[in-house]
């Protein structure tokens, strides 16, 4: 689809169906900017929500004086894999399948899915609770620790560094697997059965690998 309008002023582009695709660190700022235009029939999807992003977003709207909250949902991860290929260009390498989505209010989910554009709907799979989408947040495993372990490479502008393919070596993969094990254990204790990151990679990208390291290495979308 063609982009109808782009603007740095949120007032110019806000609609009744909003997909927030910023990092979670920007969610509160987006909520504050959206607050003057929010209404009870609006749909807001945090793509991704990360960990309980829907709750955080709703609380920020309330702080801004919003009384009747819109329909708010969160996804476990962003629906596409992309990289910035130049200052003004982004390349999408893959669209993820069965991205889990849940609503702050269970009654909102059917409304949200019915209003979702047909071009996006096939990529999302509804879940009953944002507890599931939050614990199923694979970004907490794939992003945080590898960034700390590769901060030197990341800050070196002259290095041709590919975050997943170069940054997640065998030792890094072994470390984040332990984080993933703990994530799944905490989720299970809270009543949620979630898949491992390795299983998520197999399901989402169709990769083959005996462990997390091999699944990352065999993911063509991570080689760019």
Give the label of every model feature segment.
Residues 1-15:
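Conserved N-terminal Rossmann-fold NAD(P) cofactor-binding segment
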Residues 18-19:
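N-terminal Rossmann-like NAD(P) cofactor-binding module of classical short-chain dehydrogenase/reductase
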Residues 24-86:
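Rossmann-like NAD(P)(H) cofactor-binding subdomain of soluble oxidoreductases
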Residues 59, 79-179:
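Substrate/ligand-engaging "lid" and interaction regions
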Residues 67, 121-123, 193:
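Short coil/loop linkers at secondary-structure junctions
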Residues 172, 176-222:
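Small-residue-rich helix-loop
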